[in-house]
């Protein structure tokens, strides 16, 4: 296969490896949250994509992605995911927040908005607790988190697998 043919896919493989490293670093940051007060949902399907982390807790709901290098399209993706989740929480009184974690990012968190008016917080190492407290939302109580965990666990029986109705389909 000619090098020119493989360069495009090689760049995507390298970018995916960077996203994997960033997500692992964010997993460590999220791991410092108090599990009694925060529900951390991994790889939630929102807005047509898999979102690495969705946090439900006392300071609100936050949809988080992670990348070593972010783009304005990434801002749109996490915003679309947050908007999708907002549709599932019609009585929730606060906005669903969105953010992109960039490991090694220097400086304070910043709120970015693109030309489509999609927005997200960009933040780096050790800023997650500050960012969550910054929102000031009255989010989920510990009792709400316990109830949400129980409802989620009851939604799909343990060990069940949903298979396509016809072999070879989707």
What is the role of each PLM region?
Residues 1-49, 59, 68-170:
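Surface-exposed interaction regions that form or flank ligand-binding interfaces
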